[in-house]
Amino acid sequence: MSKVLVETSARHVHVSEKDLETLFGPGYQLTVKKMLSQPGQYACAERVDVVGEKKTLTGVSILGPCRKETQVELSLTDARSIGVKAPIRESGDLEGSGACKLVGPKGEVVLEKGVIAAKRHIHMTPADAEAFGCKDKDVVSVKIDSDGRALVFGDVVVRVSPSYALAMHIDTDESNAACAGRDTMGEIVR
């Protein structure tokens, strides 16, 4: 067993409860639109605009549930196009990350930090990690054999938790480079 489903993670925002209330009003609760592959994670009906120095990305999805800190995940193409810095980071590693403004129907939030390009990663349960011979924070390479665009992604971080479901996450730039689709599988090649 060395194959893993490869999922494309498009631009999105994780909001804190405080910022959610600023953007949508006091006491506001997120509306589940669609459950995602990771247990307990969901796409919301709510959307916000992400404002950079050059341009605005309108209608960016919010993913729930709320987090401790607001985080904006963009592809490097998105970040460059709107004029924001988006260092490649693991989720939650926000110190020294990019700044932007979020605009919702009831208010605005200016983020001094929080914009990142998510480091490509694989979610695994402890049983998956054992089967793959991996441990939390290992860095592996993954080969994707797409027609005409086969490639090997290096620097893929393994994240292990009993609350995860097995899946690799790449952003839209990476997905396009690999010609990845809905049922794309990757092979850990170390």
Q: Where do the language-model regions lie?
A:
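Amphipathic terminal alpha-helices
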Residues: 146-148
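Short coil-to-beta-strand transition motifs
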Residues: 150-152
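Short beta-strand-centered segments at strand-helix junctions
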Residues: 5-7, 12-53, 58-105, 110-137, ...
